[in-house]
Amino acid sequence: MENKVYTQEEVNEICTQHEAWLKDWHIGKRADFSGANLRGVHLEGRSLREANFQSADMKGAFLKSADFSHANFEGANLTFVRASYAKFNDCIADHACFDKAHLTVAYFEGASLQRASFREAQVNFVSFREANLWRADFIDAVTGGTNFVRADIDYVAFNTGNAGNCFDDKQVAELAYHLCSAVLGSRTNSPEVRDTVRKILSLANRAESVKVFGKVQEFNGVKHVTAKETE
């Protein structure tokens, strides 16, 4: 079944009712766009806190300066959205797709973004402070000035430079842990690279992951053993 398609006029009316509901739930109605086709709609500056966009198709929507705090975007398609200065604080957006989105100076503080995708998105100066980014994908994303302080970045995929972004000490230790585990746990890298990685083992073994998986392991050709630092 195809997603319900809304006209801009219908969207405007639903947003107006939702904004009234935020002020007094007796007179308005909460917006429910779950599963809707909202491609290219204009929601700039609207207050849509706690609205439901679960599994909605919002490709190419205009969301600049809108407030989506505590909204539900689980499984939603937000590719190519224009959402600079938008607020997604404390929203649920697990498995959502923000590929190639323009999110400069957007806010995702405290948001749940597990397995969300930000491939080729512009996320410079975005705040992911205290967000859950477990297994999120930032491959080829444009970062810089991005705030990841106290965010859960376990198994996050990066392949571009992270210079200028904000990571706290615990997160740096986690990044070191996953790097050391990947390099030393296999035989695909050169001895030079393996020896270089050993120099940050003490940092890696301070990661929270050690409590769950143990210290960094290395493969010695026969079995995995606890990795040793370069003497």
Show where each model-derived region lies.
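Tandem repeat scaffolds
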Residues: E2-S190
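C-terminal end-of-chain micro-motif
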Residues: A93, T230-E231
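C-terminal segments of enzyme domains that contribute to small-molecule binding surfaces
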Residues: N162-T230
